[in-house]
Amino acid sequence: MAAQNGNTSFTPNFNPPQDHASSLSFNFSYGDYDLPMDEDEDMTKTRTFFAAKIVIGIALAGIMLVCGIGNFVFIAALTRYKKLRNLTNLLIANLAISDFLVAIICCPFEMDYYVVRQLSWEHGHVLCASVNYLRTVSLYVSTNALLAIAIDRYLAIVHPLKPRMNYQTASFLIALVWMVSILIAIPSAYFATETVLFIVKSQEKIFCGQIWPVDQQLYYKSYFLFIFGVEFVGPVVTMTLCYARISRELWFKAVPGFQTEQIRKRLRCRRKTVLVLMCILTAYVLCWAPFYGFTIVRDFFPTVFVKEKHYLTAFYVVECIAMSNSMINTVCFVTVKNNTMKYFKKMMLLHWRPSQRGSKSSADLDLRTNGVPTTEEVDCIRLK
């Protein structure tokens, strides 16, 4: 079998201890990587794994705190206030929902797997498949949402005379983001399972991840290349082209006619937003490129890692760096781009000071609404 953690596969041959080989219905091997397979050699006791465990623990704790709290604040403020609702923020909300679910559901299980139990899954096959699936769906939702945001910004800035998306089109786009992500992530749940990784002092270390049969190696590699193209290379190239064209429009093209203060303010707002989005794209590439690169080398050039004792530890660190990208997205979208905290504080004040509600202006009272996204400029949030 080729074992896969997250959405990647381990292709080398692994020979489990003879006392346990008969209980396994598949051929599965880490032997080429010289992983510890007996009580005399435990990779979880090495200094390398100890350092990796600290890095992984800090990353997962950061994801749970930043993405859990930050995305909750954003979703709550977006639900409460009409002024925060436009197409861009609705797309960001989908990214926030997926990251929030990972932070509160997947990360606690992964903290237990990587840090507490040190590479041993104790929660059963169903949860193993569910956690793998949810994490993979979240990645694809994030990627597709970022791509949709880039295209939306491109159309709004480079082709301002073209009509913007209406409510029905926006709803269809959001549904498409989720449906594509849900469908192409199905193999991460279907092939997810548990198996004995190695034995330490008569205790089994249970691996949780995707395991593809040996006779389906070609299918796995084809699937991975499809994902690599559709969910990484394609979106990155498209977003880069969109932001390059937008940058030319905002920074290098002269604006005809007299520029009023309102026009200059709108231009500053658009530049600020595009800079944030470009930083998010850069962070996405820096976080996920090592993960995909590591996976390509491991699955297509396995001899590179032959006899590399700390291979698996290195992969887990690379995987955690990739997952940490969600923290960068949350910080940028919640604290930089949107003034979300200002609206969240206002919401808290309205909740804890009910006596002041009667003195609120009609503009404030109009904030609680289910209206369709508008295109006004408000604190650089509206982006026409």
UniProtKB/Swiss-Prot annotation:
It comes from the Eukaryota. SUPFAM superfamilies: Family A G protein-coupled receptor-like (SSF81321). Keywords: Cell membrane, Disease variant, Disulfide bond, G-protein coupled receptor, Glycoprotein, Hypogonadotropic hypogonadism, Kallmann syndrome, Membrane, Receptor, Transducer, Transmembrane, Transmembrane helix. Expressed in the ileocecum, thyroid gland, pituitary gland, salivary gland, adrenal gland, testis, ovary and brain. Changing residue 85 to H: In HH3; decreased signaling activity. The keyword Transmembrane helix applies. Changing residue 115 to M: In HH3; phenotype consistent with Kallmann syndrome. The chain crosses the membrane at residues 55-75, 90-110, 137-157, 172-192, 224-244, 274-294, 314-334. One of its GO terms (molecular function) is G protein-coupled receptor activity. Its main location: membrane. Receptor for prokineticin 2. Exclusively coupled to the G(q) subclass of heteromeric G proteins. Activation leads to mobilization of calcium, stimulation of phosphoinositide turnover and activation of p44/p42 mitogen-activated protein kinase. It is linked to Hypogonadotropic hypogonadism 3 with or without anosmia: A disorder characterized by absent or incomplete sexual maturation by the age of 18 years, in conjunction with low levels of circulating gonadotropins and testosterone and no other abnormalities of the hypothalamic-pituitary axis. In some cases, it is associated with non-reproductive phenotypes, such as anosmia, cleft palate, and sensorineural hearing loss. Anosmia or hyposmia is related to the absence or hypoplasia of the olfactory bulbs and tracts. This is Prokineticin receptor 2. The gene is PROKR2.
